[in-house]
Amino acid sequence: MSALKGPILVLLGSLCFSTTGLMQVLAPQGANAVSTAFFRMAVGSICLFIWCFFTGQLRFDWKTLPWKRLIACALCLTEAQVFFFSSVKDVGVAVGTVVYIGVAPCAAAIFAFLLYRKKPSTVWWLSTALAITGVVLMNDLSAGRLGDMSALGFIVAAGFGYALYVTISPVLLERLSAEASIAIISSLVSLALLPAALCMPMQWVLSPMGLFTVFDLGIVTAGLAFTLVLNGLKQTDSTVASTLLLGEPLGAVGWGVLLLGEQIGFIGYCGMTMVFFSIVLLCWEQHRRSKTQDC
């Protein structure tokens, strides 16, 4: 069971991420991508700093922290959010989501090989292809559009940015707890987004639904989600984790059906089944490898 702890934590993190779309739907009129991303990271960092303070996880020398790695992780997340949110409207939500989610595992495999000379297994290639196909079916791209190709390029760049973050962030756990790492990274991302956020309308935050949206995004999809994923990366390869994160659109579809009354057809259910089996396949591979190493 211990071999599955890492993948399970990554999956739980992806389920937390999956509520992002739900909150954007429920957000009051006037909410925009930049200010939403800013408040998400700012609230997440504040909550995590409070948690780390009361649990004694801030007892370290700030001068000796791996600032280069922390800043690199923050830049990756900032780039991913800015590029994705600024371009997704031009290519369509369905196409943008599939490209972003689909690029990340392949990019993670490239970065893992370039940085650590790690090669993904045959099972990983099979499960990743199965999951990406499932995500495509869930989003019903037959009705989609590619839109501006330059915007599509930004979506691809966003996927590479997030994949690089997943690849390089586990090193931080050698010096910091996952909670402290995400608290610092989230604060750096929110500072980077602050200038752009100040140019956007923020009145929507003051409404009851606006406050609920901000706190849910900050606590669940930033503080809790990133912490779960980073803890999971202790025992899970970045390439495997990036594919497990394809559970996010599976969760998003589930929330839409259960809470928003959205309808999906037979093809959509086939896509959900494919993503589910790709996750089961990866977990089985992780368990098999662990038993082989123990022997």
Residue ranges and their predicted role:
Residues 4-9, 35-50, 124-130, 150-157, ...:
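Hydrophobic alpha-helical transmembrane segments of multi-pass integral membrane proteins
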Residues 41, 210, 246-295:
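C-terminal-most transmembrane helix of multi-pass membrane proteins
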